[in-house]
């Protein structure tokens, strides 16, 4: 797939009509969704890449791309893939006619490597420092539009934000004592959240954090928020309300839960059900290519 130009702000007249009541303000900078689909899932079925597994008649990666494609405020999408499934993902993207997917690129060995690769590509493409970058795990297929909108809005006040879901369980922080783990502290439950995605940043902020991290030989974070928290500790990271349904599909045991969520979504939206049937046909063809 050839790379297409990223959207840039269009000069607007000095006088503009007031937005309709309840309407979101017009974007003045690019809003770029980076969909990370490069993991191969060692805890999943090694012979069946989970990005291409069909849930509710639609490949997991397509659920995630759809969420950003259908958000009017997102201007561009970058998909980061494992080279082994690049052809299949390109086929799905091409057949579905996604208009916002600008480029599909190969990711790295680890999640942070894939993010770093995407940031390098965006810098080369000339993305402005104040662009809003939403980084999302492709294997969280049921992200809600409210979480995407909330992430975009949060970046008007902060330079970093993450979708998170309030923990309903007490969380224990532990330390090693001999061969066992023991409780070190118990944080107050109202202050504990389960990190989800998208994790969102102004481009200059996340780029600077990754530049600092790259110089650290002990750099081993598991997500992008951790990079900002560790390397730019003076930058507050806003919490955007997530949902229990925004689950990460990690093992085969997660599929039945995902199917139930998909069934509920499809039951609410007949148009989504029609799209899912089309996706199912394309996923079947892509699966045959993978074999």
Swiss-Prot record:
Sites marked Positions MEP for the nucleophilic attack: 189, 248
Pathway: Isoprenoid biosynthesis; isopentenyl diphosphate biosynthesis via DXP pathway; isopentenyl diphosphate from 1-deoxy-D-xylulose 5-phosphate: step 2/6
Site positions (Transition state stabilizer): 43, 50
UniProt cross-references to PROSITE patterns, sorted A to Z: ISPD
InterPro entries reported in the protein's UniProt record: IspD, IspD/TarI, IspD/TarI_cytidylyltransf_bact, ISPD_synthase_CS, Nucleotide-diphossugar_trans
Keywords, ordered alphabetically: Isoprene biosynthesis, Nucleotidyltransferase, Transferase
Cysteine-cysteine disulfides: none
Region of interest: Disordered: 1-23
Alphabetical GO biological process terms: isopentenyl diphosphate biosynthetic process, methylerythritol 4-phosphate pathway
EC numbers: 2.7.7.60
One function term, GO molecular function aspect: 2-C-methyl-D-erythritol 4-phosphate cytidylyltransferase activity
The reaction(s) this protein catalyses: 2-C-methyl-D-erythritol 4-phosphate + CTP + H(+) = 4-CDP-2-C-methyl-D-erythritol + diphosphate
Top-level enzyme category: transferase
PANTHER family found in the cross-reference section: 2-C-METHYL-D-ERYTHRITOL 4-PHOSPHATE CYTIDYLYLTRANSFERASE, CHLOROPLASTIC
Function text: Catalyzes the formation of 4-diphosphocytidyl-2-C-methyl-D-erythritol from CTP and 2-C-methyl-D-erythritol 4-phosphate (MEP).
Family: Belongs to the IspD/TarI cytidylyltransferase family. IspD subfamily.
UniProt name for this protein: 2-C-methyl-D-erythritol 4-phosphate cytidylyltransferase
Source organism phylogeny: Bacteria, Bacillati, Actinomycetota, Actinomycetes, Bifidobacteriales
Gene this chain is encoded by: ispD
